[in-house]
Amino acid sequence: DLTHAFDRHTIYWPTDTGGFKKTTVWEGQTEGGYYYSAYAYASAEHGGTHLDAPIHFAADRPTADKVPLARLFGPAALIDLQPSAASDPDALLSEADISAFESAHGPIAADSIVLVRTGWSARWPQRKAYLGDDTPGDASKLHFPGVSAEAARVLVARKVAAVGIDTASIDHGPSKDFMAHRVLLDAEIPVFENLTALDKLPARGAWVVALPMKIGGGSGGPLRAMAILPRKR
């Protein structure tokens, strides 16, 4: 399971101060003598483990409900950025990192789902540790790893199906131009953010299934992501 549970601890982008709200419609015994529970919830699209649909940063691109299913499952290529992230909280996946991965594990095939492991999910749900700052409404002082524009362009050239990361954004915390978002989403490559448990995956051999809520006209939405691990021999 690559998904953080949605609850009162769920981390959202700092400018969204609403958080995740769950209210009880009914919980307990009914007049009929049986137990029944039902709840209502409210959430922004871009919080917790979620999808960024192409429309999020690229005009006239697919909305959440129009992302092709073929982009939401496929073979994983997991690139480990943890060594860089351990010494630099603003580390960026580089073109050289992709080249090193391919030298060790072979070319990234078209329709792969590329996952970037930074180790940041271990900081969840501590907002300041995870985001680098916990000032409500202020996204100007964030620090966490991400993907460089150059690396994003390489992944577009590889014709990958999707790109995911275990941080709050595919762009690193200090980004002001969000070029990784712009490059990937303009190419209609969806992004999965706030993933977890990437430490359980091998560099090659896993399959990823990442199914978002089908929000009509949405720019993203809550995501249930999972990996199917290769059989041990």
Please provide the spans of the model-predicted regions.
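Active-/binding-site microenvironments in catalytic and ligand-binding cores
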Residues: D1-R233
